[in-house]
Curated annotation (Swiss-Prot):
Disulfide bonds: none annotated. InterPro entries: ATPase_P-typ_cyto_dom_N (IPR023299), ATPase_P-typ_P_site (IPR018303), ATPase_P-typ_TM_dom_sf (IPR023298), ATPase_P-typ_transduc_dom_A_sf (IPR008250), HAD-like_sf (IPR036412), HAD_sf (IPR023214), P-type_ATPase_IV (IPR006539), P-type_ATPase_N (IPR032631). The chain crosses the membrane at residues 75-96, 101-123, 306-327, 360-377, 942-961, 976-995, 1026-1048, 1062-1084, 1091-1111, 1129-1153. Involved in transport of phospholipids and in regulation of pollen plasma membrane lipid asymmetry. Residues 1-74, 124-305, 378-941, 996-1025, 1085-1090, 1154-1243 are cytoplasmic. The keyword ATP-binding applies. The lineage of its organism: Eukaryota, Viridiplantae, Streptophyta, Embryophyta, Tracheophyta. Its EC number is 7.6.2.1. It holds the Pfam family PhoLip_ATPase_C. The gene is ALA7. NCBIfam families: ATPase-Plipid, ATPase_P-type. One of its GO terms (molecular function) is ATPase-coupled intramembrane lipid transporter activity. This is Probable phospholipid-transporting ATPase 7. Mg(2+) binds at D886, D890.
Length: 1243
């Protein structure tokens, strides 16, 4: 059985180490034999029994997502618990406690360990049980499977086998990865929703092979058989390489024929498919890898504190053992009751070394309470509750989408309060990813007069005085690189003039543009609307442009039966906007079949339906940056229609296809500067011979099976996508999300650096930067770009690298030499340049420059570059980084950052699934960090410090008493006290601290974002504060022990004249500890709820109740504690007075310190607390404003920085004006004096 499992695992690999395990292939199986590692899977269609052979033994369709099973739970979970240092120590201590050397009863060590570890294991078991029940539910789903002779029956998913023919009906999930054989549609297409795989809600079209179309009924599968040879299991959702051998022919397979497990059949009655991958071989399971393990900085430092406490434990144990050895050697003769004449090995004065070694074990067990056993479980519980509060925060709930914030992991709550740098995607993160068709350029003419939202916002953020400039001859708009370019007014209004007037008017009216009321279409220009384009001089080019919009895509139309209107499911929001625009212009895409698209053209008279035969589709990829379709129109003309990035299209134009290149380039630059997303549109006419030759090459490439198939397809596509004719370009608007500028302003005031990493062109990114206040007028912009060094004799790569390094060095030097303290720099770099800047010999200089800049914008970057920049910022600065994005291309940087935040947007849920926290909109990041991050950081930091304080206070009293009793190894406390201390009596108040503490309210956090800097500066968990709390614990332990020994030792303490025995003294001392540590935590808190009062004071009351009840038990159970409270301690006033004295003495240093700090060196939150408590913000608004203004002193980005810069500019102008007036006044005075003198002389 074991060998089968090993071979099964090896079978999943892309590369086979053992030749004997590779599937055999026969040379007579056809011309397309799959060779090479990674392409060895053979599937016998409709013959699943053939896969039972050893060499083809595939995994079952049973899927398990659990971490444990009945056999592995105990060992694996115990390992998870005891690889923690503290838990391992207590395990060793519990084992040693069963031997006579232990100073405690064994259950006082074993019971707390069982409780803490059992609680953690119970939590793991509960979570895994939920996963198991979900697995059972999924595996028990029923599928319709061919049982032979054309008969189909129901079978559980887990019993499906490779090769089974499955029938899936509408709105059902696919039970495994299937090869589509046929569907209810006559042309063999079906619609699939992949939300469970990649989160995308857009429907995808799948198409079966023409040869399997006849398999459309159950009885047609009676004699069906075929062989699939394809790639091995892999996690790539978007690729599939294979062949189908059927009826003696070989047919190529691609991703359009594969139906993936957990995707859903939509808008299709039924499909038939054959199982290719099952269970953990399916692509969805191959993608279910664990996210990288992340630990917060506080948790990492906590490990070092644990090690410090271990060092303290070893130190006091060593001292105790050494003292015991000395006492044994020097004083054993005086202790007659120990029978020194018959010494035991432990008390033999002739062998003190042996006594030292044996006592060392006793001491290590005795002082083990220095290590907080309940620390880990308490922190886990607190973090879960904190995450619940984040999830339930209504201020981060998006009512439009019904999406709340979600803490997908609770391990990083406190890390939210220590973020230094935010790395953000642009599209869908800062912007909405809801595209509106706004402008276009056709045949060298720009159409569309409506101003973009970015133009309006950028104009506003750059503080353009429109009132002054409307009367001038030149009107300014924000342009590339922060310069102000002008447009001269022309006698006849051009589109640019109309556009400028729109900007001015809209800005005056509050930046509110009117909407067309059509989602995806904000275009406004009567020259193209209502068929008016027929009157334009280049109407033929406009016709081709609009047909490209309507035909060149892979979208799916859905017609509403009630209204008759079409909606579209497309792979990107851009395509939907194009189709909506085409429909508004009179070219409505109405129907798609496997081989054709149908367009209803109504530009002249009655609507005419035209059919375009789709011959080939050259899909869009991030590498190609373009897509093309080859169609045959109704006249038989073959056309290649292509759209893509302008840089890609322009280099593929023919000589006679560049007629509009210059004008279109100019328009594209303007669109980019207006923050619009642009694409160039082109076409090419093909003749039959040329197409036939190319199509045969394309078929060969598509039929090939191997690692180089994509490369071959790209090469063949390049052969066709050339000699293009440029028609025009599109410009769609991706609007800023609600509240983005305000959020960025708050984050900037909180001291956070913001870097934008986007795949858009530089002009678009820059203007988005202006719109959201990452850039502003007067900010010095540094551009790092590749420059051609003409005449250079050295290697081009080396020359480029050297040139970029020099640019970085010069820019860094310029920043250092800058004397203006208010100067702000922005770094802008593109993807090509970034490739060199991220190399090992340059990247740290680049990082140093980026850190010195107020904002960083990286344009045209790939997903891999996003991850590399994030890693550089994280590892290079050593500070906490947060990455935020919404698409699959952001997954790398989200997983690479210390904290990953996913936005549940239009692009799907892949970013969310890879993230640590998810929110619906970027603006919620403000509250997530400034409020919850600040609170969680401070709560966890104070909680951990207090944990160490209380355990040092308790543990060192054991050491003092042992020293007081001659290092005898005797514990002063009853074993039951030890059992309760960490687990019950002091754990609940500290949990209340970690869950409910607030230094200031959420409103004040947002009003005073500079408070957030306490986290990145680590003010509450630096070594000074940690050592301070430990020192406070040492002081409290000394005070408690000294006062109790001084009061209760060798003197009567009650009216009956009795002296206190060890148990009475231990009980009194333990009572003082309970009071001291609980009063200390009450003084630590700034915010109280009734829950905190109940838990703090209830813990003290619980101690007295326990003492009373335990003392009522028979002496056989309670031992020396029998009636301890009721008869011994409670009647003695000194017992109660000692508790009050200890409370006053132990809290005195903390009160003195906090009073000194608040009076002479207050922290920001101290000032805010006093202002709010005494309502000074209401009585003295100027002081409140002044305190809030501290947040903006170092802010160089955001709306606030822009306003401050404007104020400084106006003050400078005013000072210069006064200076000029003073000089003019002085000159006029001198002139008047001169005139008087000359007049006198003349007289």
């Amino acid at each position: 059985m074991g060998r089968r499992r090993i071979r099964s695992r090896i079978r999943k690999s892309h590369f086979y180490t053992f030749k004997c395990l590779r599937p055999k292939t026969l040379e007579d199986q056809g011309p397309h034999i799959i060779n090479g590692p990674g392409y060895t899977r053979i599937v016998h269609c409709n013959q699943p029994h053939l896969h039972l052979a050893k060499v083809l033994r595939y995994t079952s369709n049973y899927v398990s997502t659990t971490r444990y099973n009945l056999i592995t739970f105990l060992p694996k979970c115990l390992y998870e618990q005891f690889h923690r240092v503290a838990n391992f120590y207590f395990l060793v201590a519990a084992i040693l406690s069963v031997f006579p050397l232990s100073p405690f009863n064994k259950w006082s060590m074993i019971a707390p360990l069982i409780f803490v570890v059992g609680l953690s294991m119970g939590k793991e078991a509960l979570e895994d049980w939920r996963r198991f029940m979900q697995d059972v539910k999924v595996n028990s789903r029923k599928a319709t499977v061919h049982r032979g002779d054309g008969d189909f029956g129901r079978r559980k998913w887990k019993k499906l086998r490779v090769g089974d023919v499955v029938k899936v009906e509408k709105d059902q999930f696919f039970p495994a990865d299937l090869l589509l054989l046929s569907s209810s549609y006559e042309d063999g297409i079906c619609y699939v929703e992949t939300m469970n795989l990649d989160g995308e809600t857009n429907l995808k079209v799948k198409r079966c092979l023409d040869v399997t179309l006849p398999l459309e009924r159950d009885d047609t599968f009676q004699s069906f058989s075929g062989t699939i040879k394809c790639e091995d299991p892999n996690p790539n959702l978007y690729t599939f390489v294979g062949n189908l051998e059927y009826d003696g022919q070989v047919y190529p397979l691609d991703p359009s024929q594969i139906l993936l497990r957990d995707s859903k059949l939509r808008n299709t009655s039924y499909v038939y498919g054959v199982v290719v991958f099952t269970g953990h071989d399916t692509k969805v399971m191959q993608n279910s890898t664990k996210s990288p393990s992340k630990r917060s900085r506080i948790e990492k430092r906590m490990d070092y504190i644990i090690y410090t406490l271990f060092a303290l434990l070893v130190l006091v144990s060593f001292i105790s053992s050494l003292g015991f050895a000395v006492m044994t050697k020097m004083h054993m003769g005086d202790w007659w009751y120990l029978r020194p004449d018959k010494p035991e090995r432990l008390t033999n004065p002739r062998n003190p070394f042996h006594a030292w070694v044996v006592h060392l074990i006793t001491a290590v067990l005795l002082y083990g309470y220095l290590i907080p056993i309940s620390l880990y479980v308490s922190i886990e519980l607190v973090k879960v509750l904190q995450a619940t509060f984040i999830n339930q925060d209504l201020q981060m709930y998006d009512s439009e989408s019904g999406t709340p914030a979600q803490a997908r992991t609770s391990n990083l709550n406190e890390e939210l309060g220590q973020v230094d740098t935010i790395l953000s995607d642009k599209t869908g993160t800062l912007t909405c990813n809801q595209m509106d068709f706004l402008k276009c350029s056709i045949a060298g003419t720009s159409y569309g007069v409506r101003a973009s939202e970015v133009e309006l916002a950028a104009a506003k953020q750059m503080a353009i005085d429109l009132d002054e400039e409307q009367g001038e001859e030149v009107t300014h708009l924000p342009r590339t690189r922060g310069r102000m370019h002008g447009y001269a007014k022309m006698p006849s209004k051009t589109s640019s003039d109309i556009e400028l007037e729109t900007v001015i008017t809209a800005t005056d009216e509050g930046d509110q543009t009117q909407s067309t009321g059509i989602k995806g279409f904000s275009f406004e220009d009567q020259r193209l609307m209502g068929g008016n384009w027929l009157n334009e001089p280049n109407s033929d080019d406009i016709l081709m442009f609009l047909r490209i919009l309507a035909v060149c895509h892979t979208a799916i139309p859905e017609v509403d039966e009630d209204t008759g209107k079409c909606t579209y499911e497309a792979e990107s929001p851009d395509e939907v906007a194009f189709l909506v625009a085409a429909g508004e212009f009179g070219f409505e895409f109405t129907k798609r079949t496997q081989s054709s698209v149908f367009i209803s053209e109504r530009h002249s008279g009655q609507p005419v339906e035209r059919e375009y035969k789709v011959l080939n589709v050259l899909d869009f990829t991030s590498k190609r940056k373009r897509m093309s379709v080859i169609v045959r129109d109704e006249k038989g003309q073959i056309l290649l229609l292509c759209k893509g990035a302008d840089s890609i299209i322009f280099e593929r134009l023919s000589k006679n296809g560049k007629n509009y290149l210059e004008a279109t380039s100019k328009h594209l630059n303007g669109y980019g500067e207006a923050g619009l997303r642009t694409l160039a549109l082109s076409y090419r006419k093909l003749d039959e011979t040329e197409y036939s030759i190319w199509n045969s090459e394309f078929h060969k490439a598509k039929t090939s099976v191997g690692a180089d198939r994509d490369e071959m397809l790209e090469k063949v596509s390049d052969m066709m996508e050339k000699e293009l004719i440029l028609v025009g370009a599109t410009a769609v608007e991706d609007k800023l999300q609600k509240g983005v500028p305000q959020c960025i302003d708050k984050l900037a005031q909180a001291g956070l650096k913001i870097w934008v990493l986007t795949g858009d062109k530089m002009e678009t990114a820059i203007n988005i930067g202006y719109a959201c206040s990452l850039l502003r007028q007067g900010m010095k912009q540094i551009y790092i770009a590749l420059r051609n060094e003409e005449g250079s004799s050295q290697d081009p790569e080396a020359a480029a690298r050297e040139n970029i390094l020099m640019q970085i060095i010069n820019a860094s030097q310029m920043i250092k030499l800058e004397k203006d303290p208010h100067a702000a720099f922005a770094l802008i770099i593109d993807g090509k340049t970034l490739t060199y800047a991220l190399e090992d010999d340059i990247k740290y200089q680049f990082l140093a420059l980026a850190v010195d800049c107020a904002s960083v914008i990286c344009c045209r970057v790939s997903p891999k570059q996003k991850a590399l920049v994030t890693r550089l910022a994280k590892e290079g600065t050593g500070k906490t980084t947060l990455a935020i994005g919404d698409g699959a291309n952001d997954v790398g940087m989200i997983q690479e950052a210390d904290i990953g935040v996913g936005i549940s947007g239009v692009e799907g849920m892949q970013a969310v699934m890879a993230s640590d926290f998810s929110i619906a909109q970027f603006r919620f990041l403000e509250r997530l960090l400034v409020v919850h991050g600040h609170w969680c950081y401070k709560r966890i930091a104070q909680m951990i410090c207090y944990f160490f304080y209380k355990n040092i206070t308790f543990g060192l009293t054991l050491f003092y008493f042992e020293a007081f009793t001659g290092f005898s190894g005797q514990a002063i406390y009853n074993d039951s006290y030890l059992l309760l201390f960490n687990v019950i009596l002091t754990s609940l108040p500290v949990i209340a601290l970690g869950v409910f503490e607030q230094d200031v309210s959420s409103e004040v956090c947002l009003q005073f974002p500079a408070l957030y800097q306490q986290g990145p500066k680590n003010l509450f968990f630096d070594w000074y504060r940690i050592i301070g709390w430990m020192a406070n614990g040492v002081y409290a332990s000394v005070v408690i022990f000294s006062l109790n020994i001084g009061i209760f030792h060798v003197q009567s303490f009650c009216s009956g004249g009795q002296t206190a025995d060890m148990d009475a003294m231990g009980t009194a001392m333990f009572t003082c500890i309970i009071w001291a540590v609980n009063v200390q935590i009450a003084l630590t808190m700034s915010h109280f709820t009734w829950i905190q009062h109940v838990l703090i004071w209830g813990s003290i009351v619980t101690w007295y109740i326990f003492l009373a009840l335990f003392g009522m038990l028979p002496p056989k159970v309670s031992g020396n504690i029998f009636h301890m409270l009721s008869e011994t301690l409670a009647p003695a006033p000194i017992f109660w007075l000692t508790s009050l004295l200890v409370i006053a003495a132990t809290t005195l240093p903390y009160l003195a310190y906090i009073s000194f700090q608040r009076s002479l060196n207050p922290l920001d939150h101290h000032i805010i607390q006093e202002i709010k408590h005494f309502r000074i913000d209401v009585q003295d608004e100027c002081m409140w404003t002044r305190e809030r203004s501290k947040a903006r002193e170092k802010t160089k980005i955001g709306v606030t920085a822009r306003v401050d810069a404007k104020i400084r500019q106006l003050r400078g102008r005013l000072q210069r004006k006064h200076s000029i007036l003073s000089v003019m006044s002085g000159l006029s005075g001198v002139s008047a004096s001169t005139d008087t003198t000359s007049t006198t002389q003349h007289s």
